[in-house]
């Protein structure tokens, strides 16, 4: 049984779009197969993505809130009635007026289906953007039969089963009375036509599998889960209809040093207790290269410093976010006799005795050690 989508993302049913996006980004980062090596990570990542794809779209979310996981177009089951083929107002007219509803023309031009392709990019490429070529597996119109599915020189006949409508009518008796239900014709698969001899290249489908090279311009500032739309690079249309679109979903790899929250970047750098106590000027890595950062005397562990304009470029508009640098004071694990002696002298100069604990008489040395540990 499928889990509730709000439960999957860990948000309330009245959560707004920002809350849903924030929850998705957190879970996507946690379960991304490039980061999480657990056996079920990929399955959880897909579950999170599927939940976000629905809840992030207002129309899909409204439909889910109303019908849940059930297909809203699904009819009644059992009783000799199969509602799987029902859809649209034409079927309702069929039910009450004996099949006079408007039918869709199976030979009318139809737009091709959209394609989705996942692309992993490096953290730095997401910050500054990148131009790249990717090969997309897709279907294309068969060059031999030009999409008809028929062997060149052979004809195409109107389907005798459905008389070219592409649909079969099935009569069912239900507790509600006699119902006429339409479903896709099993002979022509909804096309309304049947080829006399199938094309040997595509075996009658009118399509062949290809790998198409697509040039992508990834803009600076994209985040994990962003989609790039490439118009006309989806599946081919039917009966002369336009092709669908290609949606490239970006998966940003994690970085060993930087973390990102919105347009801001976070990192952590170590300090010795001497640097923290006396102050210093250190070099800090940024996505632009190393910069100088002044550490004032008396800096405590887990203090944050801001490097303005060193974050992520705004995807829409000018400017960049900031980089936040958290310093962590490192307590030495091994001290030489000379170092221990100097620390004891420092404690004595402060009027305290090392080794004492509690109240105002607590030794300076122990206080300092715990401060360095962040306690």
From Swiss-Prot:
Region (Disordered): 349-375
Molecular-function GO terms, alphabetical: ATP binding; heat shock protein binding; unfolded protein binding; zinc ion binding
Pfam family, any one: DnaJ_C
Source taxon at top rank: Bacteria
Cofactor(s) for this UniProt protein: Zn(2+)
Residues binding Zn(2+) 1, per UniProt: 142, 145, 199, 202
InterPro entries attached to this UniProt entry: DnaJ (IPR012724), DnaJ_C (IPR002939), DnaJ_domain (IPR001623), HSP40/DnaJ_pept-bd (IPR008971), HSP_DnaJ_Cys-rich_dom (IPR001305), HSP_DnaJ_Cys-rich_dom_sf (IPR036410), J_dom_sf (IPR036869)
Described function: Participates actively in the response to hyperosmotic and heat shock by preventing the aggregation of stress-denatured proteins and by disaggregating proteins, also in an autonomous, DnaK-independent fashion. Unfolded proteins bind initially to DnaJ; upon interaction with the DnaJ-bound protein, DnaK hydrolyzes its bound ATP, resulting in the formation of a stable complex. GrpE releases ADP from DnaK; ATP binding to DnaK triggers the release of the substrate protein, thus completing the reaction cycle.
Protein name in UniProt: Chaperone protein DnaJ
Protein source organism: Brevibacillus brevis (strain 47 / JCM 6285 / NBRC 100599)
Classification of source organism: Bacteria, Bacillati, Bacillota, Bacilli, Bacillales
